[in-house]
Amino acid sequence: MGNTNQFNAGSNTVADSNADFKFKFLSNSLQQVYTAEKQWAVVLPILRLAVGCEDLIATLNKFEKEGKAHIQRLEVIFKTLNIPLKEAQNKDIEVLIEECYDIIDVTPINSFIRDAGLIVGIQQIQQYQITEYTSLLAQALACDEHKAVNLLRVIVHNKHQEEEQLAMAGTSQMLDEILGD
């Protein structure tokens, strides 16, 4: 009978260790996503200035507003999980942002070529964010953190909507310019 208790005690230690690992991974991922969202919030106004298409400008304005709400939700998650709020370096988002800057550097001002290039660059950032948020959601589910799960579901849903809005932004205006109408 003593062996059974030792086995159970050992299982709890392994389970606790596994739970600690999952939570630490969730914490690190949360900091990465938070940093990426903060960096994206800084870049959006710059991209908006580089765009010529009114529909795309309006879409970026909406993304900026929604991004602030995402940051607030992430801050609630930090507080709920009792994780210190800090930004971590996120090289992945930096590379994607740099690609948008490169598009601005090599394309003519107020051209559909620049707008189309920026849409592609922004779509890459959107895909990255959706992937990261979905991973974070799965981690929160694995840690049984219900409030975080609910907030992350809202963000993932909004990110998918943003992706759809971006796909439609400026399409007719750019087509008119291409066709010379």
What residue spans do the PLM features occupy?
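Amphipathic alpha-helical hairpins
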Residues: 1-181
